[in-house]
């Protein structure tokens, strides 16, 4: 069985824990004084319509009496490591998705720690007892079902879906609960008469593929409880990535370049925070028909430079577009071949590092500002179009 454990409003919950006077109040991390965007919002703040990626000025208008606090990303990372250490007490098979969520496969530790339900309860209680933080747990035989279960249980929830209860659990849910279905996809499916997951499950596979192509096959598999993905151990240790599925398919190169710029910044920042260098850059590219492609390039020298990562990613995008000019549903950038950033480096003989030093200073300043004001408080001009669109249509 697989557990999906997701910390509830993680950044905001940490602030409420550390400052008892904030408990029970609407707390907004980032976006203070109307600058930048909201990084996280407590559930009390969400009742006023505030959510992550919202402009701070909008959040203030929605809830003027909210407590706006500056983000402390290094502190959140430290707390996240403590959460992950608790996960590893119950199973070595842990796949972190971010600081505040992970998949856990507990199939091999049942004899040691009890049933999956007992393990899930113990994990949640241990996090509450040792870290004084709330977490939601979903348990299911499939990864995507465990994720849905934890989402449905939020906040501070616990939902278990037995192996023989997957169909009963999924059938009444809206199609938007399926992985890969955004607002545009939901509208398209509803227009075709598919409102619940059961509507997709009972549809003939060939008929669905004729309507929706490979995307239809993907949805049919999920609706019928078919998900062959395994929990991947040490996912973040082997690579760092960032990707976005678009509310509307993109086709113009200007918009795609803006997304690549945004993804490069976010991925490079995570790389530097982890004190790693990357020697491989991979661009992931999903077409409107759900076919997915990727192109990778190995670097001669490992890097953590945003500019270097961006330049390679843009070149990979141009190569991909020349082969695959159709509209794009998803773009992603992942960094692999990671090495320790603190390890000794080969020095240049003739001073070529001057430009690298300038780029490094820009990255350091950008990271410092992001830590103080939120990750969207400063970004490259080339990212502007995507950040504006993202803030207008945020992902909750």
Curated annotation (Swiss-Prot):
InterPro entries from the UniProt entry: DNA/RNA_pol_sf (IPR043502), DNA_pol_Y-fam_lit_finger_sf (IPR036775), DNA_pol_Y-fam_little_finger (IPR017961), DNA_polymerase-Y (IPR050116), DNApol_IV (IPR022880), IMS_HHH_1 (IPR053848), Rev_trsase/Diguanyl_cyclase (IPR043128), UmuC (IPR001126)
Site positions (Substrate discrimination): 11
Keywords from the named record: Cytoplasm, DNA damage, DNA repair, DNA replication, DNA-binding, DNA-directed DNA polymerase, Magnesium, Metal-binding, Mutator protein, Nucleotidyltransferase, Transferase
Domain of life: Bacteria
Catalytic activity: DNA(n) + a 2'-deoxyribonucleoside 5'-triphosphate = DNA(n+1) + diphosphate
CC cofactor: Mg(2+)
Keyword Nucleotide-binding part of the UniProt annotation: no
Pfam families tied to this protein: IMS, IMS_C, IMS_HHH_1
Top EC class for this record: transferase
Subcellular location(s) per record: Cytoplasm
GO cellular component terms attached to this protein's record: cytoplasm
Active-site residue list: 101
Entry binding sites for Mg(2+): 6, 100
GO molecular-function terms, A-Z: damaged DNA binding; DNA-directed DNA polymerase activity; magnesium ion binding
Cofactor note: Binds 2 magnesium ions per subunit.
CDD domains for this protein: PolY_Pol_IV_kappa (cd03586)
GO biological process: DNA-templated DNA replication; error-prone translesion synthesis; SOS response
EC number: 2.7.7.7
UmuC domain sequence ranges: 2-182
Sequence similarity: Belongs to the DNA polymerase type-Y family.
Stated role: Poorly processive, error-prone DNA polymerase involved in untargeted mutagenesis. Copies undamaged DNA at stalled replication forks, which arise in vivo from mismatched or misaligned primer ends. These misaligned primers can be extended by PolIV. Exhibits no 3'-5' exonuclease (proofreading) activity. May be involved in translesional synthesis, in conjunction with the beta clamp from PolIII.
HAMAP family in alphabetical order: DNApol_IV
Quaternary structure, from the entry: Monomer.
Name of the protein in its database record: DNA polymerase IV
Record gene name: dinB
């Amino acid at each position: 069985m697989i557990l999906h454990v997701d910390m509830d409003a993680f950044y905001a919950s940490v602030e409420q824990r550390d400052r008892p006077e904030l408990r029970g109040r609407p707390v907004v991390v980032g976006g203070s004084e109307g600058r930048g965007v909201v990084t996280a919002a407590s559930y009390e703040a969400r009742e006023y319509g505030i959510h992550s990626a919202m402009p701070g000025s909008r959040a203030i208008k929605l809830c003027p009496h909210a407590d706006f606090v500056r983000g402390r990303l290094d502190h959140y990372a430290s707390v996240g490591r403590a959460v992950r250490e608790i996960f590893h007490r119950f199973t070595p098979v842990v796949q972190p998705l971010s600081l505040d969520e992970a998949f856990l496969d507990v199939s091999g530790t049942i004899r040691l720690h009890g049933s999956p339900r007992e393990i899930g309860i113990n994990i949640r209680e241990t996090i509450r007892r040792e870290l004084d933080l709330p977490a939601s747990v979903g348990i299911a035989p499939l990864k995507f079902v465990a994720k849905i279960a934890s989402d449905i249980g939020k906040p501070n929830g616990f939902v278990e879906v037995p192996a023989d209860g997957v169909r009963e659990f999924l059938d009444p849910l809206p199609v938007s609960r399926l992985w890969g279905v955004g607002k545009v996809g939901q509208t398209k499916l509803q227009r075709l008469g598919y409102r619940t997951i059961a509507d997709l499950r009972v549809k003939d596979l060939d008929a669905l593929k004729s309507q929706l192509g490979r995307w239809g096959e993907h949805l049919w598999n999920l609706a019928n409880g078919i998900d062959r993905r395994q929990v991947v151990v040490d996912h973040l240790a082997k690579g760092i990535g960032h990707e976005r599925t678009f509310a509307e398919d993109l086709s113009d190169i200007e918009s795609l370049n803006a997304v690549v710029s945004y993804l490069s910044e976010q991925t490079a920042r995570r790389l530097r925070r982890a004190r790693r260098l990357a020697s491989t850059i991979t661009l992931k590219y999903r077409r409107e028909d759900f076919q997915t492609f990727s192109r990778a390039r190995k670097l001669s020298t490992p890097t953590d430079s945003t500019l270097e990562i961006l330049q390679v990613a843009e070149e990979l995008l141009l190569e991909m577009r020349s082969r695959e000019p159709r509209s794009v549903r998803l773009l992603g950038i992942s960094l692999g071949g990671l090495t320790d950033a603190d390890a000794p480096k080969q020095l240049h003989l003739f001073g070529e590092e001057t430009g690298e030093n300038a780029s490094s200073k820009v990255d350091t300043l950008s990271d410092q500002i992001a830590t103080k004001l939120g990750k969207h408080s400063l970004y490259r001009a080339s990212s502007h179009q995507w950040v504006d669109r993202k803030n207008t249509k945020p992902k909750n």
